[in-house]
C-alpha cells in the first residue's frame, strides 16, 4: 500500500468514526428522552 492510499483510508476511517459516534449517541439520547415524554 502506498503512503497516500494509507492516509486516504485512515481519513475515511476517522471521518466515519467522527460522524457515526455522535449521531449514534444523539439518536440513543433522543429515543430515551422520547420514551420518557410519551410514557411508552
Swiss-Prot record:
Highest taxon, organism lineage: Bacteria
Keyword Transmembrane: yes
Compartment(s): Cellular thylakoid membrane
Keywords: Membrane, Photosynthesis, Photosystem II, Thylakoid, Transmembrane, Transmembrane helix
Gene3D superfamilies: Single helix bin
Function as written in the Swiss-Prot or TrEMBL entry: Involved in the binding and/or turnover of quinones at the Q(B) site of photosystem II (PSII). PSII is a light-driven water plastoquinone oxidoreductase, using light energy to abstract electrons from H(2)O, generating a proton gradient subsequently used for ATP formation.
Family: Belongs to the PsbX family. Type 1 subfamily.
Name of protein: Photosystem II reaction center protein X
Organism: Crocosphaera subtropica (strain ATCC 51142 / BH68) (Cyanothece sp. (strain ATCC 51142))
Taxonomic lineage: Bacteria, Bacillati, Cyanobacteriota, Cyanophyceae, Oscillatoriophycideae
